[in-house]
């Protein structure tokens, strides 16, 4: 009887570990629409996993269907349910590697976020919404990572 109980507990632990590993295997999900101007193909983070006291770079690659002459990237980072970063950055700025207007084609773009030395360990989530010059959504990405 004791062996069956231990086997049951061991099986549950294996399932929980597998579920946790699967949950963080895919760090991103598109929250956009199929009609979005920028169709996201892939998102990666570097370093993976992120390290406290360093900058994490989040790279998104995809295909831009229409010309963009302006707009913003709205960034929201949460620790659990607590919002810790909320900022808006212009798509057309001096530090953007793609001068505006941005022509249709395949692109990779990154956002760098400094992680403080004292950032608590745990699950972080990010939401990145890109809008064009008319404030219409052109892409949306949700990112999950463990620190």
UniProtKB/Swiss-Prot annotation:
UniProt entry tagged with the keyword Transport: yes
Entries under InterPro entries matching the protein: GM2-AP_sf (IPR036846), Ig_E-set (IPR014756), ML_dom (IPR003172), NPC2-like (IPR039670)
Glycosylation sites: 42
Residues in the signal sequence: 1-21
Keyword terms: Glycoprotein, Lipid transport, Signal, Transport
Top-level division of the source organism's lineage: Eukaryota
GO molecular function terms noted in the UniProt entry: sterol binding
BP GO terms, sorted: sterol transport
Family: Belongs to the NPC2 family.
Function: Catalyzes the intermembrane transfer of phosphatidylglycerol and phosphatidylinositol.
Subunit description: Monomer.
Protein name listed in UniProt: Putative phosphatidylglycerol/phosphatidylinositol transfer protein DDB_G0282107
Protein's organism: Dictyostelium discoideum
């Amino acid at each position: 009887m004791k062996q069956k109980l231990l086997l049951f507990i061991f099986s549950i632990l294996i399932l929980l570990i597998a579920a946790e590993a699967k949950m963080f295997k895919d760090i991103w999900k598109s929250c956009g629409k199929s009609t979005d101007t920028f169709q996201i193909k892939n998102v990666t983070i570097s370093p993976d996993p992120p390290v406290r006291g360093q900058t994490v770079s989040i790279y998104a690659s995809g295909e831009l269907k229409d010309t963009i002459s302006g707009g913003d990237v709205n960034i929201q980072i949460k620790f659990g349910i607590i919002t810790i970063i909320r900022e808006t950055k212009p798509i057309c700025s001096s530090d953007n590697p793609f001068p505006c207007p941005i022509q249709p084609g395949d692109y990779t773009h990154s956002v760098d976020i400094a992680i403080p030395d004292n950032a608590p360990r745990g699950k972080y989530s990010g939401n990145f919404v890109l809008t064009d010059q008319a404030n219409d959504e052109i892409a949306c990405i949700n990112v999950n990572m463990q620190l």
